[in-house]
Regions:
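Metal-dependent phosphoesterase signature
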Residues: 1-5
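Asp-based, Mg2+/Mn2+-dependent phosphohydrolase catalytic module
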Residues: 8, 12-13, 17-130
Length: 130
């Protein structure tokens, strides 16, 4: 499965807690949202064609912040790529969370520069909603 089966319940819990959710993708975000089954949970979906730039440029992250109506410093950007998601979000003034995969997940090795490294979405929920 592209998205871990706990991702949707976790996003529901985040929405129930009053958090906004957005998709920022270098690919058509509607397609990702529809494939993953999370489009209905998103407040904003932005792709590179709308932002005019690819991650890790700060421009797409700035557009995400503006469309969500939330200051960059108040956003936790969740991704799966150190280079594109973590570094891009950090440069834009956001906090970053990155899912651990492969040997990082197996051995609990933190993602460099990420404010939060997590093994699964339930763990992310526990950290964010504690």
């Amino acid at each position: 499965d592209l998205v871990e089966r706990t991702a949707i319940p976790v996003q529901n819990a985040m929405k129930d807690a009053g958090l906004k959710i957005g998709i920022l993708s270098d690919f058509p975000p509607e397609q990702k949202g529809d494939i993953w089954g999370i489009r209905s949970l998103c407040d904003v979906c932005i792709g590179s064609e709308e932002s005019g730039a690819l991650k890790p440029s700060i421009y797409p992250f700035g557009i995400l912040s503006k469309k969500l109506g939330v200051a960059p410093s108040e956003i936790l950007y969740v991704g799966n790529s150190h280079k594109y998601d973590v570094l891009g979000a950090n440069k834009a003034g956001m906090k970053s969370a990155c899912i651990q995969t492969g040997f990082r997940k197996l051995f609990g090795i933190k993602i460099p520069d990420a404010d939060i490294s997590f093994k699964n979405y339930r763990q992310l929920q526990d950290i964010v909603l504690k």
